[in-house]
């Protein structure tokens, strides 16, 4: 279970997601957290309002910048333990994979693909 889910009760999360969706219908409420046991840096904020027309690849770029990941390091994002297609629109992923509370939960992990 994500730490966001542990820290915030279901009713509160659901109410917040509904408020966000009604106030910003063209945005997707996303919770992005680092995978357990990953050696990649922690992200400075977990909650994102992502434009619906953003691709998964563009969102990965946003994450890379936020955690200041060097170019030789790889980053992988998972939604419900599945690697989403890079070209997929966040709006499509949201409709298919959103949690019952209304948020889309994304986990990121990394490994150095070029070795050291």
Swiss-Prot record:
Q: Which SUPFAM superfamilies match?
A: Ubiquitin-like
Q: Which Gene Ontology cellular-component terms appear in the entry?
A: autophagosome membrane; cytoplasmic vesicle
Q: What highest taxon heads this organism's lineage?
A: Eukaryota
Report membrane topology: Lipid-anchor
What coarse category fits the chief subcellular location reported for this protein? membrane
- Keyword list, A-Z: Autophagy, Cytoplasmic vesicle, Lipoprotein, Membrane, Protein transport, Transport, Ubl conjugation pathway, Vacuole
Q: What InterPro entries does its record include?
A: Atg8-like (IPR004241), Ubiquitin-like_domsf (IPR029071)
Keyword Protein transport assigned to the entry: answer is: yes
CDD domains tied to this protein: Ubl_ATG8
* Site feature: Cleavage: 115-116
What start-end ranges are recorded for coiled-coil regions in this protein? none
| UniProt key word Membrane | yes
- Give the residue numbers of the Phosphatidylethanolamine amidated glycine lipid attachment: 115
The disulfide bonds in this chain are none
Q: How is it modified after translation?
A: The C-terminal Gln residue is removed to expose Gly-115 at the C-terminus. The C-terminal Gly is then amidated with phosphatidylethanolamine by an activating system similar to that for ubiquitin.
**Family under the similarity heading:** Belongs to the ATG8 family.
User: What task does this protein carry out?
Assistant: Ubiquitin-like modifier involved in autophagosome formation. With ATG4, mediates the delivery of the autophagosomes to the vacuole via the microtubule cytoskeleton. Required for selective autophagic degradation of the nucleus (nucleophagy) as well as for mitophagy which contributes to regulate mitochondrial quantity and quality by eliminating the mitochondria to a basal level to fulfill cellular energy requirements and preventing excess ROS production. Participates also in membrane fusion events that take place in the early secretory pathway.
* Protein name as it appears in the record: Autophagy-related protein 8
**Source organism:** Phytophthora infestans
Q: What is the lineage of its organism?
A: Eukaryota, Sar, Stramenopiles, Oomycota, Peronosporales
């Amino acid at each position: 279970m994500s730490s966001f889910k542990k820290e915030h009760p279901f009713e509160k999360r659901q109410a917040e997601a509904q408020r966000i969706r009604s106030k910003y219908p063209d945005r997707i409420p996303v919770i992005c957290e680092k995978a357990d046991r990953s050696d990649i840096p922690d992200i400075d904020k977990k909650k994102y309002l992502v434009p619906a027309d953003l691709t998964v690849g563009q969102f990965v770029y946003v994450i890379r910048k936020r955690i200041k990941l060097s170019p030789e390091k790889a980053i992988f994002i998972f939604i419900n333990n599945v690697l989403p297609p890079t070209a997929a629109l966040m709006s499509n992923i949201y409709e298919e994979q959103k949690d019952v509370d209304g948020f889309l939960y994304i986990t990121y992990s990394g490994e150095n693909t070029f070795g050291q």
